[in-house]
Amino acid sequence: GKLLDSVMKRFGIRTLAWNGNGFFVNGKNTLLRGACVHHDNGILGACSFRDAEYRRAKILKEAGFNAIRSSHNPISSHLLEACDELGIYVMDETWDYWLVHKNPYDQANENFLKWWKQDVESMIQTDYNHPSVIMYSIGNEISELGTVKGQELCDEIANYVRAFDETRPVTCGVNLLLAGMAKKGKGL
């Protein structure tokens, strides 16, 4: 047959394990020293440029960090490539909120229920082959986790992530103050 299309994609192979003794990469006990990295590049704005992302990752590595959490959306492909090259581990995060507002101007609303599956699929399909990605976060300080309905949604999202990638753990950030307010039926 005739070649219709081709793609060259770098990927990495490594083993990850967690147990009562810690986190292990390729059998070696590994302590994570991490930072939250927002998607902006200072004066460059929210654009992602390879050189800027590599520079940022290199500065973090030289400062002693070996891990980052994307705050609070999936990480750019340029930053993931830099983390792959420099040996920086990544917690790949989806959202900052689901349905309950953290401030009057955020995007928390019922549309979350229509789009979360597509967001999860897109992130995992894009980032799966990056060895730097060691885990997924399905939310940052999610208020709904203070409610039974929120906990059920968390389980549903986590299981959906695992259906696409059972090799990496899934976590979700909890803010007990916001969760307590949500439990009482209050949001911001």
Regions found by a protein language model. Give the residues of each.
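Substrate-binding/catalytic cleft of secreted carbohydrate-active enzymes
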Residues: Y54-E62, A67-L188
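N-terminal carbohydrate-binding accessory modules
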Residues: G1-E62, E81
